[in-house]
């Protein structure tokens, strides 16, 4: 079901005091009728603590990563059943930093995507192009490859999931795609999914990630195919994050 979502990806930031204070501040500041589903994705070791700090039901917890097996000799990894034990609703898969630093390819990302779905959580599939790929006119080619990699399991694979367009050149750089640039790619993704399953395309939640902040969020969220944001650095500041959430209204 298509819905408005703002998710904060805290990446590898925070220790227990900071994490506890941050989630409490966010929850306190969201003292209004929120039009968006709000999620926070802390470092995995703090997921239980964040879950236990949530009091009002205004925020849900998500995970930044998962390994696509239920159990086994995979030292240091976490499975979807483990994340589900701590009430994770959303799980990032295919984030550009995982692709870049951990060499995760399309097949592995697809395995993660379906592993999350198979266990009743919502995968947030991250797709996006590098600056070089954009300058060489390969944006749509790259994104199509990333999106279609998860479609091998059948026509309903995009049901009950989220796709996040995160242009790699805009992540952590302070650069942001213009609302029109972002809308063009979001529409391209929706049309691409529509070629697989028109109904799922209409109900697909598409969010934008790439230096989203309180100054550009309103213009981005006003675009017809942008349903919210995947927020990085700004989600580590409670006031800034909540200002972004308010831009959904």
Swiss-Prot record:
It comes from the Bacteria. GO terms for molecular function: triose-phosphate isomerase activity. Keywords: Cytoplasm, Gluconeogenesis, Glycolysis, Isomerase. Pfam families: TIM. Transmembrane segments: none annotated. GO terms for cellular component: cytosol. Substrate binds at residues 9-11, 172, 211, 232-233. Its EC number is 5.3.1.1. It catalyses: D-glyceraldehyde 3-phosphate = dihydroxyacetone phosphate. Pathway: Carbohydrate biosynthesis; gluconeogenesis; Carbohydrate degradation; glycolysis; D-glyceraldehyde 3-phosphate from glycerone phosphate: step 1/1. One of its GO terms (biological process) is glycerol catabolic process. It is found in: Cytoplasm. Belongs to the triosephosphate isomerase family. Homodimer. Involved in the gluconeogenesis. Catalyzes stereospecifically the conversion of dihydroxyacetone phosphate (DHAP) to D-glyceraldehyde-3-phosphate (G3P). This is Triosephosphate isomerase.
């Amino acid at each position: 079901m298509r819905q408005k979502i703002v998710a904060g990806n805290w990446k590898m930031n925070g220790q227990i005091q900071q994490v506890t204070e941050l989630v409490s501040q966010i929850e306190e500041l969201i003292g209004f009728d929120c039009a968006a589903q709000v999620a926070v994705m802390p470092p995995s070791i703090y997921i239980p603590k964040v879950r236990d700090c949530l009091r009002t039901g205004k925020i849900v917890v998500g995970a930044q990563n998962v390994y696509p097996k239920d159990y086994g000799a995979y030292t240091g990894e976490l499975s979807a059943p483990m994340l589900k034990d701590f009430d994770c609703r959303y799980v990032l898969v295919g984030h550009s930093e995982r692709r870049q630093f951990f060499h995760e390819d399309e097949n592995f990302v697809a395995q993660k995507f379906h592993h999350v779905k198979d266990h009743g959580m919502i995968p947030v599939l991250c797709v996006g192009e590098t600056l070089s790929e954009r300058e060489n006119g390969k944006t749509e080619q790259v994104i199509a490859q990333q999106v279609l990699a998860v479609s091998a399991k059948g026509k309903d694979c995009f049901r009950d999931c989220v796709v996040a367009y995160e242009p790699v050149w805009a992540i952590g750089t302070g650069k942001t795609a213009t609302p029109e640039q972002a809308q063009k790619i979001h529409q391209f993704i929706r049309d691409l999914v529509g070629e697989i399953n028109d109904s799922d395309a209409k109900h697909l939640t598409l969010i934008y990630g790439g230096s989203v902040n309180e100054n550009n969020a309103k213009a981005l969220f006003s675009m017809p195919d942008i349903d919210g944001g995947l927020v990085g650095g700004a989600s580590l500041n409670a006031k800034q994050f909540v200002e972004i959430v308010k831009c959904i209204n």
